[in-house]
């Protein structure tokens, strides 16, 4: 099994975006089980001081031993099928943990970006981090359905 964690800066509480992200993470866990993908978890962290450097300090302990994908506006934008294939390759290459990072309002600290194995973007636009986590969870769910042959994804 390849555990997938969406690691985010900031807590959404009961916001509708948080519920949407949790719903898609749950669906991804259920759909990915037979594919050795998951569980898919969302972990929220908060820094005690403001700023990207302080956020980096609370993110860093969660990265050890993981394949790290930083969500950043300058990262690679994946088409859904290619993203599904990429997740399958990460699993097949023996990665036991993949951590997707979503920074706070100012993005991720350069030291975290440098430590990441890769960066990915949700297109050329900038998205609020609350929406980004829901979009990422949905894409992980979509990837699991693509890999399982489910009709959820349509080209």
From Swiss-Prot:
CDD domains: RlmH-like. The keyword Nucleotide-binding does not apply. It is found in: Cytoplasm. InterPro entries: Alpha/beta_knot_MTases (IPR029028), RlmH-like (IPR003742), tRNA_m1G_MTases_N (IPR029026). GO terms for molecular function: rRNA (pseudouridine-N3-)-methyltransferase activity. It catalyses: pseudouridine(1915) in 23S rRNA + S-adenosyl-L-methionine = N(3)-methylpseudouridine(1915) in 23S rRNA + S-adenosyl-L-homocysteine + H(+). Its EC number is 2.1.1.177. S-adenosyl-L-methionine binds at residue 103. Its main location: cytoplasm. NCBIfam families: PRK00103.2-2. Belongs to the RNA methyltransferase RlmH family. PANTHER family: METHYLTRANSFERASE, RIBOSOMAL RNA LARGE SUBUNIT METHYLTRANSFERASE H. Homodimer. This is Ribosomal RNA large subunit methyltransferase H.
């Amino acid at each position: 099994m390849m555990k997938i964690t969406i690691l985010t800066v900031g807590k959404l509480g009961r916001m509708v975006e948080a519920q949407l992200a949790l719903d898609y993470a749950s669906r991804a866990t259920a759909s990915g089980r037979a594919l050795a993908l998951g569980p898919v978890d969302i972990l929220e962290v908060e820094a005690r001081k403001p700023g990207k450097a302080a956020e980096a300090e609370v993110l860093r302990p969660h990265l050890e031993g993981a394949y790290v994908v930083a969500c950043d506006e300058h990262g690679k934008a994946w088409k859904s099928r290619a993203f599904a294939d990429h997740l399958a390759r990460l699993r097949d290459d023996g990665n036991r943990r993949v951590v997707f990072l979503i920074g706070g309002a100012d993005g991720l600290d350069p030291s975290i970006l440098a430590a990441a194995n890769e960066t990915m973007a949700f297109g050329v636009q900038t998205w609020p981090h609350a929406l980004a986590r829901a979009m990422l969870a949905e894409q992980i769910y979509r990837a699991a359905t693509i890999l399982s042959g489910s009709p959820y994804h349509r080209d």
